[in-house]
Amino acid sequence: MRGDNTGVGKEPAVTERPAIKGYLYVLGSILLVTLAQLAMKWGVMQLPAWQASLDIMLAHPVPLLVITAGVGCYALSLLCWLAALHFTPLNIAYPLLSTSYALVYLLAVSIPSFAEPLEPGKAVGVIFILLGAVLVGIKPVGRKRNAH
């Protein structure tokens, strides 16, 4: 049935390559959604008082451009996420997406223009998020993980 071009009845080959590709797409989605959050935060911080007025936005084209780029990053993140779901089990990919919360917090407290305080309770929360993502991503000893 190799010559059949319909694809009916064929099982996808399970190899390490799709699993790696899936993790790369998850990583792309995480990085893009993080960039989107930071770009939109920076953009709205540059506007006088938050008003959804076209006049205010047109008077500040750079923040508007950065906000638009942030929305574009969300769109690209969605494309990466859809690709990730093709190659990665949902019960692995979705918890890994939570690392974006930790990454946004860590970058927001690290970038001086955001002036976000580093708070001990939140830092512990970030550690728990990252630990949870690692625990979900660990392959149990003696068990194989399917690519789909």
Swiss-Prot record:
HAMAP family: Flippase_ArnF. Residues 1-23, 85-91, 139-148 are cytoplasmic. Keywords: Cell inner membrane, Cell membrane, Lipid A biosynthesis, Lipid biosynthesis, Lipid metabolism, Lipopolysaccharide biosynthesis, Membrane, Transmembrane, Transmembrane helix, Transport. Belongs to the ArnF family. Heterodimer of ArnE and ArnF. It is found in: Cell inner membrane. This is Probable 4-amino-4-deoxy-L-arabinose-phosphoundecaprenol flippase subunit ArnF. One of its GO terms (cellular component) is plasma membrane. It is a multi-pass membrane protein. Translocates 4-amino-4-deoxy-L-arabinose-phosphoundecaprenol (alpha-L-Ara4N-phosphoundecaprenol) from the cytoplasmic to the periplasmic side of the inner membrane.
